[in-house]
């Protein structure tokens, strides 16, 4: 059975973040990794957020027509991230919420394309994880 690649963008952000912060982070992520969030190869297939951060990411998903996956906040510390932010470790128990969320949402065996990016206003972060999904299986 042939596998297809699932691209999941995970988000982390401060309370002060706006929809524009997340949108800019997603655009920057897409530009950095050459991904587009429309149909086709290299697309960002899904967005992901911790349950406590869900409403703003759901709004972005509605605007960009991208499905959103929810990750349990309690799962964040179970993931090894590339970034080790002291502030994130203290607040959420993980080195990067965006990286942890992307990996958890993409599923077992997922890998990050690189460390998280930070929005221009420094209020949001985004990371892109990839996983192989057997053809015919949907999440």
Report the location of each language-model feature:
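Short, contiguous clusters of charged residues that form electrostatic/catalytic patches at enzyme active sites
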Residues: 20, 24, 95-98, 102
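C-terminal edge-of-domain segments
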Residues: 99-139
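Short linear motifs at secondary-structure transitions and domain/linker junctions
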Residues: 42-46, 87-90, 100-105
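Conserved mixed alpha/beta catalytic, RNA-binding, or beta-rich assembly cores of soluble enzyme
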Residues: 1-52, 129-131, 138-139
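Structural motif
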Residues: 6-8, 45-46, 67-69, 109-112, ...
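Glycine-rich loops and low-complexity Gly/Arg-rich segments
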Residues: 33-37, 72-74, 93-96, 137-139
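Long, charge-dense
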Residues: 48-50, 54-97
């Amino acid at each position: 059975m042939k596998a297809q690649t699932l691209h999941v963008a995970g988000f982390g952000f401060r309370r002060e973040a706006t929809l524009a912060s997340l949108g800019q982070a997603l655009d920057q992520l897409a530009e950095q990794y050459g991904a587009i969030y429309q149909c086709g190869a290299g697309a960002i297939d899904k967005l992901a957020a911790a349950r406590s951060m869900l409403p703003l990411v759901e709004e972005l998903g509605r605007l960009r027509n991208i499905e959103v996956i929810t990750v349990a906040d309690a799962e964040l510390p179970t993931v090894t991230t590339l970034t080790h932010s002291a502030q994130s470790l203290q607040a959420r128990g993980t080195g990067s919420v965006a990286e942890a969320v992307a990996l958890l949402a993409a599923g077992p065996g997922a890998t990050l394309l690189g460390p998280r990016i930070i929005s221009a206003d420094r209020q949001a972060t985004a990371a892109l994880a990839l996983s192989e999904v057997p053809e015919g299986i949907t999440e």
